[in-house]
Amino acid sequence: MLYAIIEADGKQMWIEPGKYYDVNYIPGEPGDYIQFNKVLVLRQENDIYVGKPCIQSIIIKAKILKHLKSKKITVFKIKPKKNSRKKQGHRQKLTRLLIEEFYNQI
């Protein structure tokens, strides 16, 4: 089993090649390729490599599939005894990435 734990946009993600993941918006056109070089843990077959803090020689190649928005959340603020109400909605922009391959930079 091949998997890696990477840091992307300040968050840690468990990823596997051939699967897609939704992350916070990354500028770029659908079809563009991006690379992640902050690999914290890598597992190949029976070997586990742990970075201190990152594994410098491993790069992960991902393809931008599309941009989308998350589900809408509603924020409703009320101030007691003041008849003050404020309703607000928010949809986070996301980018769907397809993890294509892990490769060694050396």
Curated annotation (Swiss-Prot):
One of its GO terms (cellular component) is mitochondrial large ribosomal subunit. One of its GO terms (molecular function) is structural constituent of ribosome. It is found in: Plastid, Chloroplast. Transmembrane segments: none annotated. Pfam families: Ribosomal_L21p. Keywords: Chloroplast, Plastid, Ribonucleoprotein, Ribosomal protein, RNA-binding, rRNA-binding. It comes from the Eukaryota. The keyword Ligase does not apply. Its main location: plastid. GO terms for biological process: translation. Belongs to the bacterial ribosomal protein bL21 family. HAMAP family: Ribosomal_bL21. Part of the 50S ribosomal subunit. This is Large ribosomal subunit protein bL21c. It comes from Gracilaria tenuistipitata var. liui (Red alga). The gene is rpl21.
